[in-house]
Amino acid sequence: TIFQVDLTYKNISDFAKQNGRLVPISPQNAQWNVIKDYNDEHKDQPIELTSAESFQVSDAYAWVLENRYDAYFDIKLSFEKAVTDKDGAYHQYADKLTWFPYKGIPTYPLLHRDSKNEEFSKEYTKAIKELKEDGTLEKLSKKYFGEDVFSYVDK
């Protein structure tokens, strides 16, 4: 999430090149690793990564609006619910805040390890592979998210 005034940030590389100030992230958060990985791949132009134990999401939006920080690493669905949705808590700032994608954070189902779930796990993995190969996952993603969210996940 960035302040509309800062539209010179078209992507994460622009943000890094212009020494953008990122709202602190908890090291336990998957978003921390996304920025850490970016920095590892772009040692010549890293993003300053500051840790935070916890804060309210509402604080992050306020900090960006107050220009204390240039961006808040927000998940698209959270941004849409809070800002773009007409009933969102920050919808009154929809003309002042914007968002751009960078990378998907892979998620995985967690299954209890036992003999019953071992077979289920194999069948689940097989089914997901088939759905990916036949284009069903992409179609469902476009239907429900308006885009292929799988394209953001590193292969």
What are these model-predicted stretches?
Residues 21-25, 72, 110:
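Short, well-ordered beta-strand segments
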Residues 1-46, 50-56, 61, 77-78:
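Bilobed "Venus flytrap"/periplasmic-binding protein-like clamshell domains
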Residues 15, 61-65, 109, 124:
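Hydrophobic residues within well-ordered alpha-helices
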Residues 18, 75, 116-130, 136, ...:
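Short amphipathic alpha-helical coupling segments at ligand-binding clamshell hinges
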Residues 87-126, 147-155:
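Periplasmic-binding protein-like
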Residues 33-37, 65-104:
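A ligand-binding cleft/hinge motif common to bilobed small-molecule-binding domains
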Residues 28-52, 91-92, 126-155:
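Ligand-binding clefts/hinges and TM-proximal coupling segments of bilobed small-molecule sensing domains
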Residues 32-33, 62, 80-81, 122, ...:
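Alpha-helical elements of the RecA-like P-loop NTPase motor core of helicases
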